[in-house]
């Protein structure tokens, strides 16, 4: 598929805008969640770690299920409708259920918040990404360029949220619920089409959404699956844990918390704009260096950002390190999908992504989030960052020898149907 066909594709624009709105809504939650938990709710760093552990707990409860459901539904929008409808109640839940429960009992609040946030964001994001990636292969547009719109949505919201948070934090959540109403309208208008190439592949059975339980379980007998999980836990998961409370560390370099939050919002926006530009170019880069090398580059960038934060002493340094996030995200996300569709059976792409990537990250984060929270309280941010950075570096080096660089597809031996090779360009 080329750029011209992508830009003339109606599905590209509809699902690009869907990405924009969904990540706009998500940005009303995650970038400022640790600050909201600390300043508004009044939680300690350890209690904040408990909340994030519960988010991970319920994310891993939902992700395998959503992965299998997504592969079975194919291009049907049932699951996406469920996630979008729940997002309408985002603000009422945070303000009238989540916060009061956290004041009443940390575990009651953390578990309740984990159910909601774990479904609509932690697991829901993976389901939506896997669905749109499937649509991109069926309709004939480039997934990486559609995903770029998500970066722009996050960027716009980060600036608005950074300003509104200092006025009234509740306004940020209501902005998210308002965006969900537009998301429902866009989803109603979405009518995924099928390109001529995809129709031929469907006729051959290459893109069949009919999968069996045996096919799913056979994934866990594959060395390639476990090596991908190792990379995900040791690199992507550790990086996510590092980034969870980075906003608190970031604002410590400013004279007032308000100035730090505002600067964090602007830095996030600038980073996401750069993220979008790089995301647009990522398919071109990945096609030249390969999916494995793309994941290794992402690991190197994450190592630099985490370890660099351990030695940062000025506001300028911490802003530059924050901007490195713009380089890491495109290489990790698009590289992961490229690796999955290049190594595994494309009929199981959503299952591999939600179990091998999202599920494994969240499962490990249950322990790592609480562990990191204790380290923050005992050792401080920078000593903890050094430990996390060394873990990421070590696993990245190991992955250079364990990830597969073969262009051939590995698919369950229990299924003999022909499988075509589909790539994200």
Curated annotation (Swiss-Prot):
Q: Where is this site: Substrate binding and proton translocation?
A: 272
Membrane topology field: Multi-pass membrane protein
Q: What's in the keyword line of the UniProt record?
A: Cell inner membrane, Cell membrane, Membrane, Plasmid, Sugar transport, Symport, Transmembrane, Transmembrane helix, Transport
Nucleotide-binding recorded as keyword: no
Q: Which GO terms describe its cellular component?
A: plasma membrane
Q: Enumerate the GO terms in the molecular function aspect.
A: lactose binding; lactose:proton symporter activity
Q: Which family does it belong to?
A: Belongs to the major facilitator superfamily. Oligosaccharide:H(+) symporter (OHS) (TC 2.A.1.5) family.
Stated name of the protein: Raffinose permease
Q: Which organism is it from?
A: Escherichia coli
Q: What is the lineage of its organism?
A: Bacteria, Pseudomonadati, Pseudomonadota, Gammaproteobacteria, Enterobacterales
- The gene for this chain is rafB
């Amino acid at each position: 598929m080329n750029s011209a066909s992508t830009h003339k594709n109606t599905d590209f624009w509809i699902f690009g805008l869907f990405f924009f709105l969904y990540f706009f809504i998500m940005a009303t939650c995650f970038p400022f969640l640790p600050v909201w938990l600390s300043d508004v709710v009044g939680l300690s760093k350890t209690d904040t770690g408990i909340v994030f552990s519960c988010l991970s707990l319920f994310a891993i409860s939902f992700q395998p299920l959503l992965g299998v459901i997504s592969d079975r539904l194919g291009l049907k929008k049932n699951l996406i409708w469920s996630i979008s409808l729940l997002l309408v109640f985002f603000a009422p839940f945070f303000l009238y259920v989540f916060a009061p429960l956290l004041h009443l009992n940390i575990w009651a609040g953390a578990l309740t918040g984990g159910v909601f946030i774990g479904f609509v964001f932690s697991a829901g994001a993976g389901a939506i990404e896997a669905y749109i990636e499937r649509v991109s292969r069926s309709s004939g547009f480039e997934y990486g360029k559609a995903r770029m719109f998500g970066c722009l949505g996050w960027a716009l919201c980060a600036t608005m949220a950074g300003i509104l948070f200092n006025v009234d934090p509740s306004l940020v959540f209501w902005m998210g619920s308002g965006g969900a109403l537009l998301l429902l309208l866009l989803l109603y208008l979405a009518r995924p089409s099928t390109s001529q190439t995809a129709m031929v592949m469907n006729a051959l059975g290459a893109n069949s959404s009919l999968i069996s339980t045996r096919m799913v379980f056979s994934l866990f007998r594959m060395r390639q699956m476990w090596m991908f999980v190792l990379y995900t836990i040791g690199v992507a998961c550790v990086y996510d844990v590092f980034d969870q409370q980075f906003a608190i560390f970031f604002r410590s370099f400013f004279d007032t918390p308000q100035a730090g939050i505002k600067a964090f919002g602007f830095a996030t926006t600038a980073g996401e704009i750069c993220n979008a530009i790089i995301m647009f170019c990522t398919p071109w880069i990945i096609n030249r260096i390969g999916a494995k090398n793309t994941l290794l580059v992402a690991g190197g960038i994450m190592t630099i950002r985490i370890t660099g934060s351990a030695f940062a002493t000025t506001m300028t340094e911490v802003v530059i390190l924050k901007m490195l996030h713009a380089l890491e995200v495109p290489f990790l996300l698009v590289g992961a999908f490229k690796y999955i569709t290049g190594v595994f059976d494309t009929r199981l792409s959503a299952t591999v992504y939600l179990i091998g990537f999202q599920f494994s990250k969240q499962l490990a984060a249950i322990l790592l989030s609480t562990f990191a929270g204790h380290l923050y309280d005992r050792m401080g941010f920078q000593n903890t960052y050094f430990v996390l950075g060394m873990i990421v570096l070590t696993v990245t080096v190991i992955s250079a020898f364990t990830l597969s660089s073969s262009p051939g597809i590995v698919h369950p031996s229990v299924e003999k149907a022909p499988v075509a090779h589909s790539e994200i360009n």
